[in-house]
């Protein structure tokens, strides 16, 4: 469950390390984002010579949340950290690699490129 001012780790090699959610997209008064939702983020920490720099405003897809997600079969999945992958306006990832596992709920939200780049799909 991600809301405004939430800090997230970046799970790709775009050059950003930490981002902060500044808006949850989808609906006029939407408060929370979950896995697979698109948010607007501000880059708070970045590495030198990366594709993005500190202060940039970008879109991102939430790929891991500490809040547990209930699946249709009754199982629950949760992660240790909140993490996102930076995307462009065409919903393509900016980085060329994804770090860490991603849930298969991204497939239902049509983020197939992220699923194919991920080392593990839970």
From Swiss-Prot:
InterPro entries attached to this UniProt entry: Ribosomal_uL14, Ribosomal_uL14_bac-type, Ribosomal_uL14_CS, Ribosomal_uL14_sf
GO terms classed as biological process: translation
Coiled coil: none
Single GO molecular function: large ribosomal subunit rRNA binding
Keywords, comma-separated and alphabetical: Ribonucleoprotein, Ribosomal protein, RNA-binding, rRNA-binding
SMART domains linked: Ribosomal_L14 (SM01374)
GO cellular component, one term: cytosolic large ribosomal subunit
Record-linked PROSITE patterns: RIBOSOMAL_L14 (PS00049)
CDD domains assigned to the protein according to its UniProt record, in alphabetical order: Ribosomal_uL14
Subunit structure: Part of the 50S ribosomal subunit. Forms a cluster with proteins L3 and L19. In the 70S ribosome, L14 and L19 interact and together make contacts with the 16S rRNA in bridges B5 and B8.
Record's function text: Binds to 23S rRNA. Forms part of two intersubunit bridges in the 70S ribosome.
Family: Belongs to the universal ribosomal protein uL14 family.
Designated name of the protein: Large ribosomal subunit protein uL14
Species this chain originates from: Rhizobium johnstonii (strain DSM 114642 / LMG 32736 / 3841)
The gene coding this protein: rplN
């Amino acid at each position: 469950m991600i809301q405004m001012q939430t800090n997230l780790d970046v799970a790709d090699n775009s050059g950003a390390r930490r981002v902060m959610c500044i808006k949850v997209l989808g609906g006029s008064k939407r408060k929370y984002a979950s896995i697979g939702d698109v948010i607007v983020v501000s880059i708070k920490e970045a590495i030198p010579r990366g594709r993005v720099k500190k202060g940039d405003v970008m879109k991102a897809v939430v790929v891991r949340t500490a809040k547990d997600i209930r699946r249709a079969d009754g199982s629950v999945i949760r992660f240790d950290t909140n993490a996102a992958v930076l995307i462009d306006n065409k919903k393509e990832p900016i980085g060329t690699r994804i770090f860490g596992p991603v849930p298969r709920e991204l497939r239902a939200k049509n983020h197939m490129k992220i699923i194919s780049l991920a080392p593990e799909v839970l």
